[in-house]
Amino acid sequence: MMTMLRGWITMIVMLTAINAQAACSWPAWEQFKKDYISQQGRVIDPGDARKITTSEGQSYAMFFALAANDRPAFAQLFNWTQNNLAQGSLREHLPAWLWGQKDPDTWSVLDSNSASDGDIWMAWSLLEAGRLWKETRYTEVGTALLKRIAREEVVNVPGLGSMLLPGKIGFAEANSWRFNPSYLPPQLAQYFSRFGAPWSTLRETNLRLLLETSPKGFSPDWVRYESKQGWQLKAEKTLISSYDAIRVYLWTGMMHDGDPQKARLLARFKPMATLTMKNGVPPEKVDVVSGNAQGTGPVGFSAALLPFLQNRGAQAVQRQRVADHFPGSDAYYNYVLTLFGQGWDQHRFRFTVKGELLPDWGQECVSSR
């Protein structure tokens, strides 16, 4: 009788644990998988008629899978990326940035150039997956990928030093370089500094990029640097802070409070917080030189600013907007911004002062809506 009773108790405890794990999963991530990720591990952007997949999307999804302790999804994403974007090996090749429907009968790489924002997040996620899950294979591939990024996407710029190019082709001329300030999150730059040159100095040059290109407190989507003339802020085409730059504020907000760069960046970008508080919504576009804003940013912008805003009342306004207008199944970019911003806001993950992932795999249930 006692043996049978113990058996029932054990079964009840196990079922309770399983139900608790299911109930306390990350609902927004589970919905993202249903709406955007194929059974093979391909993140699909339905907003493009070619049903495209980008290295950025694959890398972000790998991060979310790691934060959610979703090892099967991570493995699927990794395998699909390696087999379809990296010619079978992320040790040997940077992933192509764009894949999709080439013609009615052909699905393949559409642009073989790389995109360093995806490469950076992918290398970091692999290294952290190796550490947290004790998976040597991920550590080895992440290390090899990071070395390849340093060889193929990092350049020495006179007057600046080591800088991360947006991709291996098309961003460097004889005396001119084009950069995207959102491509290297400061906490990831801090993490990579443990690997020595060029990462040990890239963190400081990346800070210069962020601070020196935001004269009015708004980071540009893209900016050019010339060897003898510096940053080209008054370019022939107006520099805009918009869909790329929103990630600069997101990364800044998610930095560890003990990181000395965070206070400097929050101070520099305070005008973005002030403008959002004044209008109740983030702007869609801001002229980097004049500070003039226009349009209303989509709901993903509100989610991205949840870690960045330091005023609790301002956070509450954007939090409510996200809850009221949660991205659907046809808004890839808004959804990934929401997974980052809202996920952080719900304490599903944090970054340590060294840039490592601090997941909350055992947290209480938190609603995503």
UniProtKB/Swiss-Prot annotation:
Enzyme nomenclature, EC number: 3.2.1.4
Record pathway: Glycan metabolism; bacterial cellulose biosynthesis
Gene Ontology molecular functions: cellulase activity
SUPFAM superfamilies, per the entry: Six-hairpin glycosidases
Top enzyme class: hydrolase
Paired cysteines (S-S): none
Catalysed reactions listed for this entry: Endohydrolysis of (1->4)-beta-D-glucosidic linkages in cellulose, lichenin and cereal beta-D-glucans
Keywords on record: Carbohydrate metabolism, Cellulose degradation, Glycosidase, Hydrolase, Polysaccharide degradation, Secreted, Signal
One Gene Ontology term from the biological process aspect of the record: cellulose catabolic process
Subcellular location: Secreted
Active site residues per record: E56 (proton donor), D117 (nucleophile)
Endpoints of the signal sequence: 1-22
InterPro entries: 6-hairpin_glycosidase_sf (IPR008928), 6hp_glycosidase-like_sf (IPR012341), Glyco_hydro_8 (IPR002037), Glyco_hydro_8_CS (IPR019834)
Gene Ontology CC terms: extracellular region
Family label: Belongs to the glycosyl hydrolase 8 (cellulase D) family.
Biological role stated in the UniProt entry: Hydrolyzes carboxymethylcellulose.
NCBIfam families assigned to the protein according to its UniProt record, in alphabetical order: PRK11097.1
Protein name: Endoglucanase
Species assigned in the record: Salmonella typhi
